Amino acid sequence: MPGGMLLRGFRIDPARAGAGAARLPCLAHGPVEVALRQNLTLLVGENGAGKTTLLEALAAACAIRPGGGGSYAETEASRPATALSAAIELHVSGHRPKGLFLRADRFAETMAASGRLPMPGTGARGRAEWRLADEQSRGEGVLSLLSARVDASEQLLYLLDEPETGLSPQRQMALLCLLDSLHRDGRSQALVATHSPILMSHPGCDLLWLDQDGIARRPLEEIPHWRDLRRFMRDPQQALRRLLE
């Protein structure tokens, strides 16, 4: 197993979930067990597959709150995921890992609460990183924050929900390079929920597909997001005729 595997896997038994827990389609047929093989894992699926909720439940199980640092803080919006975390059995290497959990759709809220959410690296540098990110667009702010953490070479478990949100294709490529740096460094680990075929194309990542049948590995060529975009780009005019006729 490669270095940086802070989280080696997890098991989810929906029968153990707390009251009001989110119901994930991938748990429709009972418990699911996932072994993580690479320190860069991408969670992929259609809208409503439960990628965000799964990441948030994993954050709660690891006691990683949005923005990183401290204990997980439940909110009204996160309550279903927090209840689901009771159903998760973590397979960790040693102690429960420190980490960074970011949801792109709540980045502004996280930044607004930055005074209460210290980075794993605290002090003047950490506050400067928050200020820099706060002055940028949402997509660029997420990218700057991640860049500062990866450059610091801290050993962290990154739980990232759609970090490509708000980024142009060119900046998604920059994000891909950033994730590659994390992957090559080998000390940290990232689980990334994404719809981006650009991120999915990383040659060293593990792709996990979520649907009503569970959670399963798939090669890139079998991921609809990547396959359909490739088909469209090969012959846009033919694809448009089929779509619009």
Language-model-derived ranges and their functions:
Residues 1-31:
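N-terminal pre-Walker A segment at the start of P-loop NTPase domains
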Residues 31-38, 149-153, 184:
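Phosphate-binding P-loop
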Residues 40-42, 155-159, 189:
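Residue-level preference for the first positions of well-ordered beta-strands
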Residues 40-42, 52-119:
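ABC ATPase nucleotide-binding domain signature region
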Residues 45:
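The Walker A (P-loop) glycine that initiates the GxxxxGKT/S ATP-binding motif of P-loop NTPases
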Residues 48-49:
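ATP-binding Walker
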Residues 99-107, 113-114, 119-151, 157-174:
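Conserved ABC ATPase signature
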Residues 170-245:
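C-terminal lobe/lid and adjacent interdomain/linker elements of RecA-like ASCE P-loop ATPase modules
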